[in-house]
């Protein structure tokens, strides 16, 4: 008896589903290409509910690794010099990062977020790497475990030996010499890739800089990097005026009363808005 291809496909789908898995066409999961959209991107959230969005965002409105408030553009000069001098990039980046990690050593998660000790008491006793934004879904234990696993995986992949978060966190100092080398190497590899083939993207899971968009009631918006931190750091430091980002979610200022950490009483609305508004400061 001949078995047609459709029957085989149905049989395979049933097997996959019986294992608790689901197969979906790429056209349903690839981001909506909205790079030509010029007005407030929040509009797209209503046009394409539940979909990830591809935007071309002004670089000056973005925040991420080595480019948070108070440290913006410190890599710009050295990154261009590193780009123009193949073979010297690691030495140049190492010197710059050593200064950054020595200068920026917040005592705890509260200081990392820029709030006083009395404004977020839970964060005073937490190390900087346990900081979270007021709009994050609050599960401190899960977030801590995930961040530790991510750092361990990234460090081990680059260094070739086990190195956990006790050696330091990429966003601030202090860091060990091994952790410094991990960050130097990650930036250098991105820089070399851009030098070789330009800035590339694809529709896969790791194909873009992933971000959330913060929207103000007056129409202004900013974006925060969630994934692709080193790509963002290099591209922004090289002076690109805009970046292609994949937007995963929108955070509306007027929804502050609904933000998870606010409803749980971990942040007051006043402090939550202070953290939010810091991203809109000139």
Show which residues each predicted segment covers.
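Membrane-proximal basic amphipathic "stem/tether" segments
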Residues: 1-77, 85
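Short, solvent-exposed loop/turn segments at secondary-structure junctions
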Residues: 60-61, 216, 230-231, 250-252
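Short alpha-helix boundary/capping and kink motifs at helix termini
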Residues: 79, 83-93, 154-224
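A structural boundary/capping signal
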Residues: 84, 90-97, 111-117, 121-123, ...
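Extended, charge-rich helix/loop segments that form flexible
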Residues: 101-171, 176
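A sequence-level detector for short glycine-anchored, His/Arg-bearing signature motifs
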Residues: 216-238
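Glycine-rich phosphate/pyrophosphate-binding loops
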Residues: 240-249
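Amphipathic, charge-rich alpha-helical segments that serve as recognition/docking helices
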Residues: 252-282
